[in-house]
Design a protein with these regions (language model features):
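N-terminal secretory signal peptides that target proteins for export/translocation
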Residues: 1-8
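Short helices/loops that flank or line small-molecule/ion binding pockets
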Residues: 95-103, 121, 220-229
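Alpha-helical, coiled-coil/dimerization segments enriched in small aliphatic residues
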Residues: 74-77, 190-217
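A short, structured surface patch at a secondary-structure boundary
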Residues: 46-101, 105-111, 209
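Short helix-initiation/N-cap motifs at beta->coil->alpha
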Residues: 32-36, 87-96, 131, 213-222
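Extracytoplasmic substrate-binding proteins
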Residues: 28-31, 37-38, 105, 113-189, ...
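Bacterial N-terminal signal peptides
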Residues: 11-24
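A ligand-binding cleft/hinge motif common to bilobed small-molecule-binding domains
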Residues: 112-120, 232-252
Length: 284
């Protein structure tokens, strides 16, 4: 017995439909977060709450900005996230407001004390942090996996590396070897040599006066910086005003010579966040 062309066509269509229906639209997603917790999703999340600016920015550069339903108060890039509901900050995120968003994934730092409570209420939570450049790459990789677009992490990291290399090529020879102190807080928390900021400065030819032995973001004695006598002081413009009133700081050569890089908030945000804009930060 032979089949006509139309019969063969119907068989092929049925065979294709069976294959299509037997394969799920999305394979389950499983990622181990930075606290060692296994985060499992049946499908890519569609209602994401991000409680850290670097995580918000990572979601967006990976093409999933439209899946964000709310963020922390400090998330301000890209422009579209400014319009999203704001749920508080690292220490005061509002639990009720988070629940009201009905998120299928909450992204936050392990420093946020809400993680355990959110899990107890049945929410899927991923705790992700980064203190150095390899950890920033790992953060991007894990966020991309959680979003269901794992291949995009490598693409975005290549963009970051390309931007850093371009910035390296722009640094004048005379500027290389500049001894830098980078302040992240007026409470004298500094970006050490082993932090992502410190590693970025090193790649740009600077010498960090806070060596790796002190850790990524150590709290320093005020006298430490005075004794270190950096050639350049970098900090947020909002913190620069009271610099000369610090005991002994008016005697520092960098202060006397005006070698103070007081960054406006928009630039400071780019440089201080361990996320996908670090390539742009190298060019600030």
């Amino acid at each position: 017995m032979t089949m006509g062309c139309s019969s063969w066509f119907r068989v092929l269509v049925m065979w294709w439909l069976c294959l299509t229906l037997s394969v799920p639209a999305h394979a389950a997603i499983s990622v181990v977060d930075d606290q060692g917790a296994k985060v499992t999703l049946a499908a890519p999340p569609q209602r994401i709450v991000s409680l850290l600016p670097s995580l918000t920015e990572s979601v967006c550069v990976l093409g999933a900005c439209g899946r964000l339903v709310a963020t922390d108060r400090w998330s301000n890039w890209p422009e579209s996230v400014r319009r999203l509901p704001k749920l508080g900050g690292l220490d005061d995120a509002n639990l009720e407001l988070i629940l009201a968003q009905r998120p299928d994934l909450v992204l936050l730092s392990s420093s946020n004390r809400l993680a355990a409570r959110l899990r107890a209420l049945g929410l899927t939570v991923a705790e992700l942090d980064a203190e150095d450049l390899p950890q920033v790459q790992r953060l991007l990789t894990k966020v991309a996996a959680l979003l269901g677009v794992p291949q995009q992490a490598a693409v975005q990291w290549q963009v970051i590396e390309s931007d850093i290399r371009k910035a390296q090529a722009m640094v004048p020879a005379a500027a290389r070897g500049t001894r830098v102190y980078f302040e992240v807080s007026s409470a004298l928390y500094a970006a050490g040599e082993s932090s992502y900021i410190g590693q970025l400065l090193t790649r740009l030819g600077a010498v960090n006066v806070v060596s790796a032995q002190w850790g990524p973001f150590p709290k320093l004695n005020p006298e430490f910086v005075v004794r270190a006598q950096p050639d350049l002081i970098m900090l947020s413009a909002t913190e620069a005003e009271g610099l000369v009133r610090r005991p002994g700081w008016s005697q520092m050569k960098a202060v006397q010579r005006g070698r103070i890089c007081a960054m406006p908030p928009v630039d400071y945000d780019v440089l201080s966040r361990p996320g996908p804009r670090l390539g742009a930060a190298a060019q600030v």
